[in-house]
Design a protein with these regions (language model features):
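Lipid interaction determinants
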Residues: 17-85, 91, 98-164
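Sec-dependent N-terminal signal peptides
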Residues: 4-14
Length: 164
């Protein structure tokens, strides 16, 4: 009885020690990335309600070299406007779109972000990317964002910029 129990326990332990399968080193199979990257390059606009009763507008410019600048305009429920800008790197991996914020732009000055802050690295599942529409979901908080592609000269509509 003890011998049978020891054999069974050994088999269970060995089953958990199996080696992983081989990995593919060639990146040639990344066709999805090659199709999506050019679709994201350009300027995108979104306007979303906030849980506090206001809304946030965003103009994100994704460059072909993998850098981005995004301008935010937050309008609270009283109508107070606050503008900000951040810059960093963006990319795709499969159906994941990601950004890494490297700092903020204040006037014409770049303020670098402290290195290694997890809050400045964001990953999103791409839900839709076609016909000038980009919908994506935050992996972390599950918020869904929707943006439309706009002309390179596009600016925030109708509200004068806040005084910084």
């Amino acid at each position: 009885m003890i011998k049978a129990l020891c054999i069974a326990l050994t088999l269970v332990c060995l089953a958990g020690c199996s080696k992983p399968g081989p990995v593919v080193l060639d990146k040639a199979g990344h066709g999805l990335q090659q199709k999506q990257r050019p679709l994201i390059v350009g300027k995108w606009y979104s306007d979303s309600p906030t849980t506090e009763g206001g809304h946030v507008m965003e103009i994100a410019e994704h460059r072909a070299n993998g850098t981005y600048v995004v301008s935010f305009r937050v309008i609270d429920k009283t109508g107070k406007v606050k503008d900000s800008q951040e810059a960093g790197f963006w990319g795709t991996a499969g159906n994941i779109y990601f950004t890494i914020t490297k700092g903020w732009i204040q006037g014409s000055k770049f303020i670098p972000a402290p290195p290694g802050l997890a809050d400045l690295e964001d990953a999103y599942q791409i839900l839709e990317l076609k016909n000038g529409k980009f919908r994506y979901r935050s992996v972390e908080n599950k918020n869904v964002y929707s943006a439309i592609k706009v002309d390179d000269t596009f600016q925030f509509p109708g509200i004068p910029p806040s005084k910084g």
